[in-house]
Regions:
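N-terminal targeting or regulatory segments adjacent to alpha/beta-hydrolase or S9 domains
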Residues: 1-128, 412-427
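Proline/glycine-enriched tight loop/beta-turn segments at coil->beta junctions
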Residues: 138-143, 151-163, 186, 331-333
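Cap/lid segment of the alpha/beta-hydrolase catalytic domain
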Residues: 166-227
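Alpha/beta-hydrolase fold nucleophile elbow
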Residues: 240-253
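Glycine-rich nucleophile elbow surrounding the catalytic serine of serine-hydrolase chemistry
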Residues: 251-263
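Hydrolase active-site cap/lid region
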Residues: 260-307
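The feature captures the conserved acid-bearing segment of alpha/beta-hydrolase catalytic domains
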Residues: 287-351
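C-terminal catalytic histidine-bearing segment of alpha/beta-hydrolase fold enzymes
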Residues: 353-427
């Protein structure tokens, strides 16, 4: 009885949170070949795109896009590969919120942050900037932005420098996950809080929300995913240049998908925290509550869940579970955390359970943690603290294990951790 009442209460709460924003826009289906054609042309694969006359036939266009996805899966080393940027630089400026909703309390918070900055009452922060290898029609989106949280120099000069790239959820404002980065600093781990494509300072002026990251434009969504993945890998390049030796990624929701794909194609990434995880990109968009407006546009064009799954298979983790355990990705050296929620209406629980089973099947070293809430309620009290604890404690232990490994320590699980270390993570 209690369980049923709790579930009903949680689903109602989750639904209220996913429906309170009224600025979601229903957009029609677009195939978006123009968004991925530059990559195909530069790699001698342009023949995969039908002629412009043929693309007027939706059946021909859909079949071609499915074939391109299959091609990108086979050549994912190229698709998620890149030319290393040459314009890495640190920029100082006052942090801004860049809200994605127009609720009065959010706009008031944004105005207050701007006021304090204009009066010199807030400190400037450092941001890593560079040009993304994946180019789009939006110059502001192609200038990558990652807030830099360097950890204090450790007293032991022989201790390896460790860093993590953090990617928040879809439509996150620019302050989301900043507190996690500060916690990692207290563990001696530096952090780059990466703005996803079309998010915060990278968001085109024509948008209120980060709609172009995930939309009814099939090709643009694929391009945004590729851009996010190569941007993560470029961040690791820069960290490597700064003398860092151990690398991790933490992604929430959409950021989790991006983080997984980056790790599956980069052997340097060994610590992996997937906060809300799913199998197929198309399944989440079709079945998730927060993407109802996207599904509406796709459904009006006659698409089905099964067909959408094929159209976005090249950006779906399910296509790369074997890849993440490959020798190329150094899968045997990776450690992973999967966090999912029992009452998730955005990343339905059934898909998260499939992730857990897939990780077991391929032999990835991982641990799973379950939250007694939903997707959006993860950001509410007390669940945000539970989620933060799971992620922080895992990241702390995983990086500690890498340090011990470097000292020749046994790779078996560590014994009970001293209370002082537990307190460090709790703070």
């Amino acid at each position: 009885m209690f369980r049923e009442r709790y579930a009903r209460w949680m689903y109602e709460w989750e639904t209220r949170l996913t429906t309170r924003d009224e600025n979601r826009v229903v957009r029609p289906l677009e195939w978006g070949f123009d968004w991925i054609e530059p990559f195909l042309q530069s790699h001698g694969l342009s023949s995969a795109v039908p002629s412009s006359d043929a693309l007027h036939d939706d059946a021909v266009a859909e079949a071609a896009m499915v074939r391109i996805n299959q091609l990108l899966i086979r050549r994912s080393d190229l698709f998620f590969g890149y030319e290393r940027p040459t314009d890495f630089r640190l920029e100082e400026r006052h942090p801004e919120l860049f809200p994605t909703n127009v609720r009065p309390e959010t706009l008031a918070k944004d105005a207050e942050i701007k006021r304090l900055a204009s009066e010199g009452k807030t400190e400037k922060a450092k941001f890593l900037r560079f040009t993304s290898p994946e180019r789009t029609p939006y110059a502001e989106n192609d200038l990558v932005n990652a807030r830099w949280y360097p950890a204090a120099e450790h007293k032991d000069p022989k201790r390896p420098k460790q860093a993590i790239v953090v990617m928040p959820q879809w439509n996150a404002d620019a302050f989301s996950h900043n507190s996690l980065c500060a916690i990692f600093n207290r563990m001696g781990i530096s952090a780059l809080r990466l703005s996803k494509p079309y998010h915060d300072v990278r968001r085109p002026a024509e948008l209120e929300r980060s709609d172009y990251a995930v939309s009814a434009n099939i090709g643009r969504t694929i391009s945004a995913c590729r851009q996010a993945v190569v941007d993560i890998r470029c961040c690791v390049d820069w960290l490597e240049d700064q003398g860092y030796e151990h690398f991790g990624v933490l992604g929430t929701s959409l950021g989790s998908c991006y983080a997984f794909l980056a790790s599956a194609h980069d052997r340097r990434i060994r610590v992996n925290a997937f906060n809300h995880a799913s199998t197929s990109f198309g399944d989440v968009v079709w079945a998730g509550q927060s993407t109802r407006h996207i599904r509406q546009g796709l459904e009006e064009a006659g698409l089905t869940q099964e067909r959408l799954r094929a159209l976005w298979s090249a950006i779906s983790p399910i296509s790369f579970y074997d890849r993440i355990m490959s020798a190329e990705a150094a899968g045997g050296d990776k450690r992973a955390l999967v966090v999912y929620a029992d009452y998730d209406l955005t990343f339905p629980r059934e898909y998260s359970l499939q992730v857990v089973e897939a990780f077991k099947r391929v032999g990835l070293s991982f641990e799973a943690r379950v939250l007694p809430c939903g997707h959006y309620t993860t950001g509410e009290t007390p669940f945000q603290y539970m989620d933060g604890w799971h992620m922080g404690w895992f990241v702390y232990r995983a990086f500690k294990a890498l340090r011990q490994e470097g000292c020749g320590a046994r790779s078996a699980p560590a014994k009970a951790v001293p209370e002082v270390e537990e307190d460090l993570v709790a703070r």
